């Protein structure tokens, strides 16, 4: 009986609202109930106001019953049922199992001066009962000993009935505890407890008797509590409501009941959360998480220790754990560092039901429905099953991704440089077109054309044409999305933050009224758009057609392929070439270079024609724009989506670089005349054709700007710089400012990618410091061109530093005779730089380089000059003792002779381990001073970058007190001052291996010379080499063939010049006899010369053959006239002049004989010439190195 102590706390009966809550009707947030008894139970919201104190009365009695069930759970006599009923305002709760002990309570009897029994104390005396002082492992929901008393104090009448197996106790309590009738005690073998009561409804704000709605609401709420209890007590105990068993005997059933209305298709995940230590391990928690996009905020139902608690640390623990997993999974899935998800986001689509017992908790809040326990209890002892978290997280992330997609669909941005068509978005919206201009200059052209309406009423105008700028570049949307397959099999395309915030693309979406969730398959869907089509207005160059237009097409294909299918995406095809014939005002226009080439071949001469190129829209002047816009509709071409387009979009713009690399290994197949005619006849362009021609051409051009050709080791920019330098400095090799020379290159070599990048390339081409890319720079730098200290980034401004051609090296490495034989790039119809050079030595393996492009990585480490010279000489010289050995190696694709990395200007060491070489820096240790002095760094490691990398290494800096850099641009002197007693510890922690000692390991004084030998091929595309030998072997035939071509061409030119000089000498001898001065005109004179067997010759071609091929020389040189004779002056007919010509003929004949001899020499024509040129290059390099590449 000691458990039922009584407290003298009489005032509690007066302060009735202290624990029960408000004593009148109020709005209770989240109040729910079960109104029907259908097969599928459903919790519905209760919208009417109710009294918290009344609900507390019912709740306290129900919690007492579940407490009793838990207390008897492990005893022989268990609680097998709890019967709850509510009828006509009367509430009843009964449970079997041991009843309340029926015994006299001495203390209470003494105070009351009558016989008082334990059941009366438990139900009628405040702060009395078993819940006043609970043990730490207690899992009862009751607290403070006031629960049942609240019910009694707020009841008109109540009947307490309990039986303990020996006696049955019945007691009536009336008038809110004012009248407590003596109990009736009778013998009985039953065991149960039942509480029946009629609350004081009227005083709590209700009708008396209850109205139908009040009865219905209260019954629904009590039914809900009964269902909650069913989940709490589990299968061993049956909960009845109004004589019918509740069907929510599990946490999943309870979760379904709560979410059947709001999220009938929600995904339910269940788990048992266990603890690792007593008393918590004795009471695992059951959890069900319903995940659905229908939920907009986190909600939970917690039945802990039988109490429906509204908040608690257990919920906080669950939310935080879920959030951590969801955030991690979300980031892994979306692969977008800029996308963040918050705790609110990660849990907003979850409804969690938690059921179970937690020992030692406290109840706070006015109604004692807020769970309180130290949060670290959950962190320390409870663990949530990973399978539950994984499956639930997958569902949550799927919903988050879907919500992001929908949310981003309505993202608004400020649309710059947009002019709306007057009829856009109106009844005639489908007649409007949005002109998407590449940039500001294109907008200016469009504005000029669209404002011609007054003079050209039938042309386009702002009535039906809007304008928007593409800003000169478009984001590749294909690489900014993540495709995710949800549990239901649906594929969600999630745009990353960069894409959704992209002002250009988002501006197009807003202006057109596009919806990412609409496919636009039907006319009804397309009719909702603000424009009937979009027309791309881009330059006719690779950047415009190949890149910008390709990316715009890819964007529409990615999100709205149906719009391309239905002809929504178009382009303005402007003339690329106009030919103005002298005396005519209307030009002949060509839209493709192939069309012009075909036309030009049919013309006898273009002497009276002016050919103008228009790669940029800004190149068209006003009168040409007016002409274009008169026929505007004829220039609008529609894109079509053919079968192969989908794959090609993926190849060129997707993330799989291997597919793109396979495609870009080959060059572009130009459009045929038939294809261009077909395009013009229907004004339709298949997307696949655009991708295979324009986009591929752009990609290959981009590669050539970033990866060198294996024949000359140069990118396109460096080749333009060299060609421009040879031309610019040909007559006078005086120094020029970098920015001035850059302007010359841009002008004469047609460089279109900005002066900043061009000037940077010029500076790099003149850099000659230890570790620079070029061991053999093509320019001599005057001024500060950067140093090893900052890896060349400390070069002076292009306005202040100057260059001049390294002519002694250039003239020997790139013989002038070769320039007439190389293929050339033509820009706007004019010859620019060679497509590639073929230097005397393989420059591609003589210099350093590194750059990525389109999935390829290019990395080379210069090879030893002596090894290269030995290999090339052995290949050329048949008398070389290694000649046959090398040819055998080439034939069988093996390596015999060495080809080591270059150690020029490097004071460190090179070592080979396995298939790779490694470079090592050097150091000196002063144990007395506790200092390591670094005297050389690994190859191509800039000083400042090296020091920063060491400082960022925390495990190294623990041993370092200070790093001092005394290095110059030529030498390395870095002092590493160690902390006391650090040297031995360094030796222990940074182990010495075969490949590096402890200090080399500690100070990172080693790097691997790993190569990626990917180069551009002569006819475009990429070739992948495995070894430097392969590059050499591939280069050799090109250089060898060049000597044969050079000699054959010289042979043809010499023969023609001998023919011409011989004819002139003959004419001098016969001039008196012919006496051409007596004839009236050239025609007569030419006839006489022809009759006397003088050959008609093309004097200009023979004297200056320049780029003419042997075929052209043989065809055109003998199809000339007699100007070479008729233009002779009198002094050229003198004997002395004739004598000089005869001597000239002899010299030419001697040279011709020599050329014929060279053509016949072994092992191939011109071998001896090559050897001579190798010697000349070597001599120039030695001089360059001896003079720091100044050559003086």
Swiss-Prot record:
DNA repair as UniProt keyword: no
Feature type site, description Transition state stabilizer: 799
Cellular compartments annotated: Host cytoplasm
Record protein name field: DNA topoisomerase 2
Purpose: Type II topoisomerase. Processively relaxes supercoiled DNA. Displays DNA-supercoiling activity only when associated with the viral histone-like protein.
GO terms of biological process kind: DNA topological change; sister chromatid segregation
Induction (record text): Expressed in the early phase of the viral replicative cycle.
Family statement: Belongs to the type II topoisomerase family.
Cofactor note: Binds two Mg(2+) per subunit. The magnesium ions form salt bridges with both the protein and the DNA. Can also accept other divalent metal cations, such as Mn(2+) or Ca(2+).
Entry-linked PANTHER family: DNA TOPOISOMERASE 2 (PTHR10169:SF50), DNA TOPOISOMERASE/GYRASE (PTHR10169)
Catalytic reaction list: ATP-dependent breakage, passage and rejoining of double-stranded DNA
Cofactor(s) essential for the protein: Mg(2+); Mn(2+); Ca(2+)
UniProt-listed Pfam families: DNA_topoisoIV (PF00521), TOPRIM_C (PF16898)
Keyword DNA-binding: yes
Topo IIA-type catalytic domain residues: 707-1174
Binding-site residues, Mg(2+) 1: 438, 539
UniProt GO MF annotations: ATP binding; DNA binding; DNA topoisomerase type II (double strand cut, ATP-hydrolyzing) activity; metal ion binding
Keywords on record: ATP-binding, DNA-binding, Early protein, Host cytoplasm, Isomerase, Late protein, Magnesium, Metal-binding, Nucleotide-binding, Topoisomerase
Residues involved in ATP binding: 64, 95, 142-149
């Amino acid at each position: 009986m000691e458990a039922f102590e009584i407290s003298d706390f009489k005032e509690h009966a007066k302060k009735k609202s202290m624990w029960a809550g408000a004593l009148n009707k109020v709005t209770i947030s989240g109040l729910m109930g079960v109104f029907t008894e259908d097969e599928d139970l459903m919790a519905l919201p209760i919208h009417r106001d109710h009294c918290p104190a009344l609900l507390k009365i019912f709740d306290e009695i129900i919690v007492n019953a579940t407490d009793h069930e838990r207390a008897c759970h492990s005893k022989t006599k268990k609680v097998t049922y709890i019967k709850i009923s509510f009828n006509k305002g009367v509430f009843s709760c009964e449970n079997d199992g041991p009843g309340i002990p029926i015994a006299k309570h001495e203390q209470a009897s003494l105070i009351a001066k009558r016989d008082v029994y334990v059941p009366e104390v438990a139900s009628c005396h405040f702060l009395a009962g078993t819940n006043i002082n609970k043990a730490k492992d207690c899992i009862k929901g009751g607290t403070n000993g006031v629960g049942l008393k609240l019910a009694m104090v707020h009841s008109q009448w109540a009947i307490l009935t309990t039986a303990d197996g020996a006696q049955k106790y019945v007691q009536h309590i009336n008038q809110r505890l004012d009248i407590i009738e003596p109990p009736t005690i009778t013998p009985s073998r039953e065991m149960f407890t039942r509480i029946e009561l009629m609350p004081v409804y009227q005083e709590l704000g209700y009708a008396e008797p209850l109205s139908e709605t009040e009865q219905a609401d209260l019954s629904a709420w009590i039914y809900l509590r009964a269902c909650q209890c069913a989940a709490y007590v589990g299968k061993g105990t049956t909960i009845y409501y109004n004589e019918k068993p509740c069907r929510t005997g599990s946490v999943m059933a309870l979760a379904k009941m709560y979410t059947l209305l709001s999220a009938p298709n929600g995904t339910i995940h269940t788990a048992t959360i266990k603890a690792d230590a007593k008393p918590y391990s004795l009471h695992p928690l059951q959890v069900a998480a319903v995940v659905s996009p229908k939920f907009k905020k986190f909600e939970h139902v917690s039945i802990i220790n039988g109490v429906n608690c509204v908040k608690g640390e257990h919920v906080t623990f669950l939310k935080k754990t879920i959030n951590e997993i969801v955030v991690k999974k979300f980031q892994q899935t979306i692969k977008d560092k800029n996308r963040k998800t918050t705790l609110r986001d990660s849990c907003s689509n979850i409804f969690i039901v938690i059921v179970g017992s937690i020992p030692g908790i406290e109840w706070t809040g006015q109604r004692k429905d807020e769970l309180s326990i130290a949060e670290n209890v959950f962190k320390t002892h409870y663990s949530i099953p990973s399978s539950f978290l994984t499956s639930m997280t997958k569902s949550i992330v799927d919903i988050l991704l879907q919500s992001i997609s929908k949310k981003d669909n309505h993202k608004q941005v400020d649309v710059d440089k947009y002019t709306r068509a007057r009829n856009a978005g109106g009844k005639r919206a489908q007649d409007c077109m949005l002109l998407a201009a590449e940039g500001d200059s294109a907008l200016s052209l469009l504005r000029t054309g669209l404002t011609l309406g007054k003079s050209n009423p039938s042309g386009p105008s702002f009535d039906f044409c809007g304008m928007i700028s593409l800003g000169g570049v478009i984001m590749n949307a294909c690489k900014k999305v993540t495709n995710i397959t949800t549990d239901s099999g649906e594929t969600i395309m999630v745009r990353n933050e960069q894409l959704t915030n992209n002002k250009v693309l988002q501006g197009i979406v807003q202006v057109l009224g596009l919806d990412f969730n609409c496919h636009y398959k039907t006319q009804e869907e397309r009719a909702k758009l603000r424009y009937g089509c979009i027309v791309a207005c881009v330059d006719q160059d690779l950047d415009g057609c190949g890149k910008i237009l390709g990316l715009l097409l890819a964007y529409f294909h990615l999100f709205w392929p149906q719009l391309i299918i239905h002809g929504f995406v178009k382009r303005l095809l402007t003339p690329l070439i106009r030919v103005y014939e002298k005396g005519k005002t209307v030009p002949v226009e060509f839209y493709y270079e192939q069309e012009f080439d075909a036309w030009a071949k049919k013309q006898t001469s273009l002497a009276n024609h002016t050919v103008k190129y228009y790669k940029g829209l800004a190149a068209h002047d006003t009168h040409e724009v007016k002409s274009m816009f008169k026929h505007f509709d004829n220039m609008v071409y529609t894109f079509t989506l053919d079968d192969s387009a989908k794959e090609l979009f993926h190849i060129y713009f997707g993330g799989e670089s291997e597919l793109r690399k396979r495609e870009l290994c080959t060059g572009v197949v130009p459009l045929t005349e038939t294809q261009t005619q077909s395009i013009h006849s229907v004004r339709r362009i298949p997307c696949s054709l655009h991708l295979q021609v324009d986009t591929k051409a752009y990609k290959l051009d981009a590669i050539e700007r970033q990866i060198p050709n294996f024949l000359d080791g140069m990118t396109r920019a460096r080749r333009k710089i060299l060609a421009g330098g040879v031309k610019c400095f040909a007559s006078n090799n005086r120094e020029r400012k970098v920015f001035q020379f850059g302007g010359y290159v841009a002008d004469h070599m047609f460089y279109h990618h900005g002066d900043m990048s061009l000037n940077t390339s010029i500076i790099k081409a003149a850099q000659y410091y230890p570790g620079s890319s070029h061991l053999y720079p093509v320019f001599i730098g005057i001024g500060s061109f950067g140093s090893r200290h900052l890896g060349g980034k400390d070069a002076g401004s292009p306005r202040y530093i100057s260059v001049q051609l390294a002519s002694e090296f250039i003239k020997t490495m790139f013989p002038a005779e070769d320039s007439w034989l190389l293929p050339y790039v033509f820009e706007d119809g004019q010859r620019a730089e060679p497509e590639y050079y073929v230097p005397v030595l393989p420059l591609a393996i003589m210099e350093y380089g590194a750059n990525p492009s389109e999935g390829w990585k290019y990395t080379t480490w210069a090879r030893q000059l002596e090894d290269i010279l030995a290999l090339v000489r052995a290949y050329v010289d048949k008398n070389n003792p290694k000649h046959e050995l090398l040819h055998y190696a080439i034939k069988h694709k093996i390596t015999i002779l060495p080809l080591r990395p270059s150690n020029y200007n490097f004071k460190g060491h090179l070592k080979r381990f396995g298939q790779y070489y490694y470079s090592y820096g050097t150091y000196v240790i002063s144990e007395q001073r506790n200092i390591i002095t670094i005297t050389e760094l690994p190859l191509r490691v800039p000083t400042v970058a090296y020091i920063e990398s060491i400082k960022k290494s925390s495990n190294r800096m623990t041993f370092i007190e200070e790093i001092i850099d005394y290095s110059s641009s030529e030498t390395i002197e870095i002092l590493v001052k160690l902390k006391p007693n650090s040297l031995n510890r360094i030796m222990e922690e940074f182990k010495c291996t075969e490949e590096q000692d402890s200090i080399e390991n500690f100070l990172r004084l080693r790097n691997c010379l790993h190569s990626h030998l990917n180069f551009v091929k002569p006819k475009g595309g990429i070739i992948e080499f495995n070894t430097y030998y392969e590059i050499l072997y591939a280069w050799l035939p090109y250089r060898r063939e060049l000597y044969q071509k050079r000699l054959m061409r010289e042979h043809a030119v010499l023969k023609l010049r001998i023919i011409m000089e011989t004819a002139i000498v003959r004419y001098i001898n016969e001039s008196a006899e012919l006496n051409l001065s007596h004839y009236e005109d050239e025609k007569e004179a030419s006839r006489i010369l022809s009759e006397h067997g003088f050959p008609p010759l093309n004097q200009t071609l023979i004297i200056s053959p320049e780029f003419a091929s042997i075929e052209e020389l043989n065809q055109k040189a003998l199809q000339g006239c007699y100007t070479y004779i008729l233009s002779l002056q009198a002094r050229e007919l003198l004997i002395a002049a004739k004598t000089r010509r005869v001597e000239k003929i002899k010299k030419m004949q001697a040279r011709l004989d020599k050329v014929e001899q060279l053509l016949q020499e072994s092992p191939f024509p011109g071998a001896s010439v090559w050897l001579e040129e190798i010697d000349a290059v070597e001599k120039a390099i030695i001089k360059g190195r001896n003079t720091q590449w100044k050559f003086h």
